[in-house]
C-alpha cells in the first residue's frame, strides 16, 4: 500500500510538472502579453527551484523525490523569456541567466552555504508567491495568469508532502512544501476571484 502510494505520488507529480507551466505559457502566447504576470515573482520562483534542486542533489536524496525540478526550471526559463519578450526587453534576461548559472556552482562550494540557502529557499519561494499576490491585488486583474497552473502547483506540493514523509522525512523540506501548498491555494483563489470579477464586469 505504502509503496503504491509513493509510486503514484512520485509519478503523478512528474506527469503534472511535465506540463505545469504550459497553460501559463499558452495563456501568455494567446494574449500576446505578460499582463498579470509578476517578473519579481517569476525570478524568485526560479531562484527557489534552483536552490531546492541543488540541495536535493547535494545531499543525494532519491532522484524521484525531486526529478520534476529540472523540468520546472526549464519551463520557468521559457516563461521568463516570453515575459521579457512581451515587455520588449529580451536583452535584460542575460544578466539574470548569468547569476542563476553561477549560483548553481557557488551553492555547493561549502556545506554551510547550501544549508543556509535551503533555509532561505522557503522564504524566497514564499516571497515569490506574495509578489504575485501583491501584483494581482494591485492591478485587480488576473490577465494572462493561469489558475490551472497555480492549482496544479498546489497539487504537486500536496504530493511532495506525502513523499517527503515517506522517504527523507526532512523537516526543512516538509515545512517548505506545507507553506507553498497554502500559498499556491491562495494565489489560485485570487486568480479565480479576479477572473470572476472581470467576467461580471463584461
Swiss-Prot record:
DNA repair is among the record's keywords: no
Keywords: Membrane, Signal, Transmembrane, Transmembrane helix
GO cellular component, one term: membrane
Pfam families hit by this protein: PQ-loop (PF04193)
Subcellular location: Membrane
Signal sequence, renumbered to the chain: 1-19
Topology of the protein relative to the lipid bilayer: Multi-pass membrane protein
Protein name according to UniProt: Solute carrier family 66 member 3
Amino acid at each position: 500500500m505504502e509503496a503504491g502510494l509513493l509510486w503514484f505520488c512520485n509519478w503523478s507529480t512528474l506527469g503534472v510538472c511535465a506540463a505545469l507551466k504550459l497553460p501559463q505559457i499558452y495563456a501568455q502566447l494567446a494574449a500576446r502579453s505578460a499582463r498579470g504576470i509578476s517578473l519579481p515573482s517569476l525570478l524568485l520562483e526560479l531562484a527557489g527551484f534552483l536552490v531546492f534542486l541543488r540541495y536535493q542533489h547535494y545531499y543525494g536524496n532519491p532522484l524521484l523525490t525531486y526529478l520534476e525540478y529540472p523540468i520546472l526550471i526549464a519551463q520557468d526559463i521559457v516563461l521568463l523569456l516570453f515575459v521579457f519578450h512581451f515587455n520588449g526587453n529580451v536583452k535584460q534576461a542575460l544578466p539574470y541567466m548569468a547569476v542563476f548559472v553561477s549560483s548553481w556552482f557557488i551553492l555547493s562550494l561549502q556545506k554551510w552555504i547550501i544549508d543556509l540557502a535551503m533555509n532561505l529557499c522557503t522564504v524566497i519561494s514564499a516571497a515569490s508567491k506574495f509578489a504575485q499576490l501583491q501584483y494581482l491585488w494591485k492591478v485587480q486583474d488576473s490577465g494572462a495568469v493561469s489558475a490551472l497552473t497555480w492549482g496544479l502547483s498546489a497539487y504537486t506540493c500536496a504530493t511532495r508532502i506525502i513523499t517527503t514523509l515517506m522517504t527523507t522525512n526532512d523537516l526543512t523540506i516538509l515545512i517548505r512544501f506545507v507553506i507553498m501548498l497554502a500559498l499556491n491555494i491562495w494565489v489560485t483563489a485570487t486568480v479565480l476571484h479576479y477572473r470572476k470579477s472581470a467576467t461580471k464586469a463584461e
